[in-house]
From Swiss-Prot:
Keyword Lyase included in the entry's annotation: no
Keyword Coiled coil: yes
The name this protein goes by in its record: Ankyrin repeat domain-containing protein 18A
Biased composition (Basic and acidic residues): 286-310
Lineage per the UniProt record: Eukaryota, Metazoa, Chordata, Craniata, Vertebrata
Organism, scientific name: Homo sapiens (Human)
InterPro entries: Ankyrin_repeat_domain, Ankyrin_rpt, Ankyrin_rpt-contain_sf, CC144C-like_CC_dom, DUF3496
Keywords assigned by UniProt, alphabetized: ANK repeat, Coiled coil, Repeat
Amino acid sequence: MRKLFSFGRRLGQALLSSMDQEYAGPGYDIRDWELRKIHRAAIKGDAAEVERCLTRRFRDLDARDRKDRTVLHLACAHGRVQVVTLLLHRRCQIDICDRLNRTPLMKAVHSQEEACAIVLLECGANPNIEDIYGNTALHYAVYNKGTSLAERLLSHHANIEALNKEGNTPLLFAINSRRQHMVEFLLKNQANIHAVDNFKRTALILAVQHNLSSIVTLLLQQNIRISSQDMFGQTAEDYALCSDLRSIRQQILEHKNKMLKNHLRNDNQETAAMKPANLKKRKERAKAEHNLKVASEEKQERLQRSENKQPQDSQSYGKKKDAMYGNFMLKKDIAMLKEELYAIKNDSLRKEKKYIQEIKSITEINANFEKSVRLNEKMITKTVARYSQQLNDLKAENARLNSELEKEKHNKERLEAEVESLHSSLATAINEYNEIVERKDLELVLWRADDVSRHEKMGSNISQLTDKNELLTEQVHKARVKFNTLKGKLRETRDALREKTLALGSVQLDLRQAQHRIKEMKQMHPNGEAKESQSIGKQNSLEERIRQQELENLLLERQLEDARKEGDNKEIVINIHRDCLENGKEDLLEERNKELMKEYNYLKEKLLQCEKEKAEREVIVREFQEELVDHLKTFSISESPLEGTSHCHINLNETWTSKKKLFQVEIQPEEKHEEFRKLFELISLLNYTADQIRKKNRELEEEATGYKKCLEMTINMLNAFANEDFSCHGDLNTDQLKMDILFKKLKQKFNDLVAEKEAVSSECVNLAKDNEVLHQELLSMRNVQEKCEKLEKDKKMLEEEVLNLKTHMEKDMVELGKLQEYKSELDERAVQEIEKLEEIHLQKQAEYEKQLEQLNKDNTASLKKKELTLKDVECKFSKMKTAYEEVTTELEEFKEAFAGAVKANNSMSKKLMKSDKKIAVISTKLFTEKQRMKYFLSTLPTRPEPELPCVENLNSIELNRKYIPKTAIRIPTSNPQTSNNCKNFLTEVLLC
């Protein structure tokens, strides 16, 4: 039993150590490489920098670092109240969790940052959120020494009975943490004294385990239950007895005595007020309870005697009690104790099973722990290898960057040398420029002399341009006159087209009248022959009108072509005007030309509209022709060849339109050769079809002549026999009436038969549906019959099985009697074997306890070794990280140096570009000045000199730089302002 209690104590110590690791160290273990810019600013408490980061990127409000910590978590952990208020003002997530599911409120409470916690609670933070271990903010407040945070949390409705994963309420957690002031505070705030953890330990048991006598007195003052047992069936008194905590045990015994005295007083007071019948029952109950208490005390005394550790005070107390209550109750107590012993045995068996299961679970946990440790070792080796690879890569990058730096140094030196050479070349260029400026002064003097002659030439050129402009204006006037004439022609063509449209409308009216007359002819059949000739004459007249309209259309097309040619001539004239205007640079002519172009485009659009109207008219003519052909078909068979002629006309019209298109296409530019080819192919196909249609027309005309001859013969025959057969017309009419009556009757019969057929078909459909329904019912009936047959078979089988079961029951009854006898024998044997097993179990339990102690020792030793190895690895890892950070800092320095070198190179390259541009400008100026000098020297007037008789003319000499005099030449000028006037005139000409 003592070993079991020591195991409980060790378990409590282990829990305390794990709890210290869990709650120790306020804030976070922070490394700089894990953080972003906003997180660093929050840790430093730089609210302005945090606000700047948020204005740049609003998403960074709830941004996480590499360990899932937000800005609010870090600010609360470090007590940065300004940053916390800023983030809450920006409406960040107040109850956001980190990797361990801890809220910013938990971090503020854990770090004892009361101001941050108050701000969070006032902004509506939830104090009842649980982390991975099931702890709330109140658990963290209990672990701290002060009670102000706990008061704040309780005022904001924190749950005082919140359970963590170990089953600890804040009160139990305070006892485990040995925080007496927190226990007092929680008891004042009505915390539950009778709460129990996962091992069913009460607050009193935990206080006894941790040897906290002051907390025990507090709990006893609150009337806590002394008799409550934990998972192992032990009370607080048992733990005090086994741990030799005499003062605590004495406190518990004194509390028991007080409770008994109070109970007896209450009983006496009640008995005085109650009836005598109820008094006996009360006394018997009180005696029974008292006897049970005495028996429990005797049991404790026996245990104390066996251990020889009970003080003499308790023995004297037991003897006095024995003397008070007498020996006559001992027999009853012995019987009760026997019953309790049987119950204890059963409990011990049940507990043994539990302990075995717990041992198995502990072994499994150890195995899992070893596996996890191995996996951690593998992970550590992998991480070490990975970091070593990263270090090698960084070293390689460092070497590469060093080589690049050396190259850049060489490039820099080379560029410096080039810059020096450029400086020298610039110095030489400047010297040359000074010389050129001196020469320029000489050239300017000569140029002023030439300005006068140029001015005269420019005046003559301007007079010529004015003459040309006058000619152009005259030509434009003529073009406008022609344009107006063309407009008049266009109006005339429009009027002609309107007249033709009216003529077409009249033709349409004539056609409609002809159709009406044809209908009347059909109705008036006897007078048909006389009216046929009239309709044929009208048809011929209509054809003549159509031909006339076609001729008029051809004339209009020719007029349109002439107008187009005139438009092309106008374009040529306008192009000539443009060339003249470009040479003369006259703005007025350009504006007039634009107006003419607009008018020309307008005329073109109108011409296109005329062509469209013409095409529509052609379509209307074709429709008229087709309608005529249809009417002629209905009128007689003999005039069927007209269809062929109409088709021929249509095809001929199509060929004519295609030729027109060809004519238009020939005028277009050379870019549309492909369209030309397609049109040529279409023309060839249309010619071929036109030839075939002509052949067919000839054949149709021959057939038409034959039909006409037949018609003439028939007409003559009819005229001959008209008088003779006039009497027969009445008979024919009566025959026709009879045939019509018969035809109507047949139609009625046919309709009746169709109606009967539809009725029969509907009846057939209904019968088919009824047939399907009956077929389905038949199938269902067959299925029912099969099921009935199966049920009958099953019934027979069940009857046979019932008979078999009855026979078996009789046999079983006989065997039961034998089994009962055998059972009684087995029970006796089982009792004997159970006694043996109890002895064996006690031995094995002792062995198991020894093995458990050894396992715990081995585990602790292995854990210590692993912790040491982990610490070594962490040290190595920290060294690696420091080396990596040093390398990164060096890299950043190299990068900064590289960036500076690049900037210097860029600035040098820009300077070089500027110098190159300056040199190019100077060279262009020199070149232009050389050309000017040559031009001026070539245009100087020749003067005879008496001193040089051999020289006749300056133009015959090649003026090179050798022959230019170094002294300044002075030429007298009559007007000193002429040079400035010339300059202004030249600038105006260049701007134009």
